[in-house]
Amino acid sequence: MLFGALQDIQASRIRAAERQVDELLRHYPNFRLGHLIKGDLLLAHARPLSVMGDGVRSAGPRIDELRAEALQRAKRASEPPPPGALPWEVWQLSANERHLLVVDTSSSRLFVFENLAGKLERVADYYVSIGRLGAGKTREGDQKTPVGIYHTAGSISPARLTDFYGSGAFPLNYPNEWDRRQARSGHGIWLHGTPRDTYSRPPFASDGCVVLANRELEDLASRLDGASVPVIIAPKIDWVLPEQSASRAAGFHRALESWRVDWESRDTERYLRHYASEFQTQGKDLAAWREHKLNVNALKTFIRVGITNLSVFQYPGNQDLAVVTFDQEYQSDRLANQMRKEQYWRQVDGVWQIIYEGPAAAPRTAVAMSQGSIIKVAAKSSRKSPKIRRS
């Protein structure tokens, strides 16, 4: 309705634009941008409009923010993503993960992808607000939204939050392993809603969180089937066809399979060639990892490693960094176990090597939305009252 009204205004169809805006405000009476456009349309009966907010006596930063919101919303409608295209960062989503969220901070959009029979389909997208000073968080309090690969970590119902957060919140696991490597600080980055008297916020308005309109947060929650949903936050999405993604990922997949085969070989030096000099894991550097692997492999007569449910994402803004998660089934004559593993791989001179590996976070909470409230099915460890922070 909003984009249709803007098109009507551009074509000088004032009456048609009024009908669309009236319908919009009937559904969303707290939509401030809609009220601004309504005022402009009333003024247009007396004289031509020059800019949005022409009828406001004293234009200021608030009107500029509403103009910026209108521009971002109109751009999405006039420049939609190509049909069937995927974000540049998406190489593979695990078969057991139903959804993927991708935030394009430059266009103020959150895109929802659903895994349908092994094919990723874009099923929804929403306008969002990000940090007051943009994207690329580096330190606590810098009012920026982080750029990276994260996942939702549970949910917080509106009953446990102030009205500022609207219909609830989905915390993200910022800082991730790469953030910590870069000495980035801060915490409490959430996807959350808006106060009840506010339909949406300007494009740059939070302290770093990603903020959605309440109705759209509720729609998002109704789609998600678990709390551990991958979230990619990118400075700008470049859209590519799935076959282009598969071609770009082929070299990485060969490196991953070579790592698995070399681990099974029990040739520790061959296996260690897949680890970079800056490798770290759970307090061990490469030298300590080498000593550990030499000791444990010497005691084994066979090793078998299975990899399933693989997800691979290229890091936003860094074509030489990939984040991988998978279910690992390990068997030897002395040990058998299963785990969800996360690895960070870095490419140097065309060679992919591991700079971090460790256990991946397991889902803790299932979420659903009913009549404007997030319903939680939570582990006991997640029942403590959250520390309230504003963003």
Explain the meaning of each model-derived region.
Residues M1-E23, H27, R254-S265:
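Alpha-helical segment of the N-proximal tetratricopeptide repeat
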Residues S78-W190, T194-S200:
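Gly/Pro-biased beta-strand-loop elements
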Residues N96, L294-E342:
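Surface-exposed, charged secondary-structure patches
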Residues G154-E257:
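Exported/periplasmic cell-wall-interacting domains
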Residues S265-E278, Q282:
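Short, well-ordered alpha-helical segments enriched in acidic and aromatic residues
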Residues A336-I375, R383, K387:
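Short beta-strand edge/turn micro-motifs at domain boundaries
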